[in-house]
Amino acid sequence: MNNIYQKDLGLQQYNKVFENMLEFTSTRTPETNDEIWLVEHPAVFTQGKHGKPEHILNSHNIPIVATDRGGQVTYHGPGQAVIYFLLDIKRNKLGAKKLVTTVEQACINMLDKYYNLKAHIIDGAHGIYINNQKIASLGLRIKQGKSYHGIAINTNMDLTPFSYINPCGYSGLKMCQLANFYQEADIKKVQQQYTAEFVTLLNNSI
């Protein structure tokens, strides 16, 4: 397996990072190393490529950005650990379904290993849940065998803006965050812990 570079981008506007993902993916070659980007975004709603406007109930002047990822509308904001996967999935011998399950399982493993939290998935509703409340959302895009976008883990943030939308297209979906269970939750630690679990699973799948 090739090297995977980690880039900690800090706090960055969503639009800028989205544009950078598109550029990286469109210009990469078979020799380009895979990258994982760790980032935090100012408040923004992002709409998936099949997103329906009626799922945004009231934006409260929070910007709305249309993207090409899978899924419906979600919210990003400070205190949320976002991890983007810029991978050559063909080179890593991953199909789209395997990539999704690896992204999900890494989050489940992280929450169990570091926080003793038993998380789960729900059939037909991608994401990670604790007691049927969503703690992590994912949306990916694969273009010509290359992935981008990723997972957002609610860590230590204001969850109120999720009530302004139907998160991921589900009316009344309850959200939670790591800080509900672990007051000292820190996004930098979560990003590093998650990435370690993801890379371990990826290596084991090769």
Swiss-Prot record:
Residues 30-206 form the BPL/LPL catalytic domain. The active site is at residue 168. It catalyses: octanoyl-[ACP] + L-lysyl-[protein] = N(6)-octanoyl-L-lysyl-[protein] + holo-[ACP] + H(+). One of its GO terms (molecular function) is lipoyl(octanoyl) transferase activity. Pathway: Protein modification; protein lipoylation via endogenous pathway; protein N(6)-(lipoyl)lysine from octanoyl-[acyl-carrier-protein]: step 1/2. InterPro entries: aa-tRNA-synth_II/BPL/LPL, BPL_LPL_catalytic, Octanoyltransferase, Octanoyltransferase_CS. It is found in: Cytoplasm. GO terms for biological process: protein modification process. One of its GO terms (cellular component) is cytoplasm. Keywords: Acyltransferase, Cytoplasm, Transferase. SUPFAM superfamilies: Class II aaRS and biotin synthetases. Its EC number is 2.3.1.181. Substrate binds at residues 69-76, 137-139, 150-152. It comes from the Bacteria. It holds the Pfam family LplA-B_cat. The record marks 134 as: Lowers pKa of active site Cys. Belongs to the LipB family. In the reaction, the free carboxyl group of octanoic acid is attached via an amide linkage to the epsilon-amino group of a specific lysine residue of lipoyl domains of lipoate-dependent enzymes. Catalyzes the transfer of endogenously produced octanoic acid from octanoyl-acyl-carrier-protein onto the lipoyl domains of lipoate-dependent enzymes. Lipoyl-ACP can also act as a substrate although octanoyl-ACP is likely to be the physiological substrate. This is Octanoyltransferase. The gene is lipB.
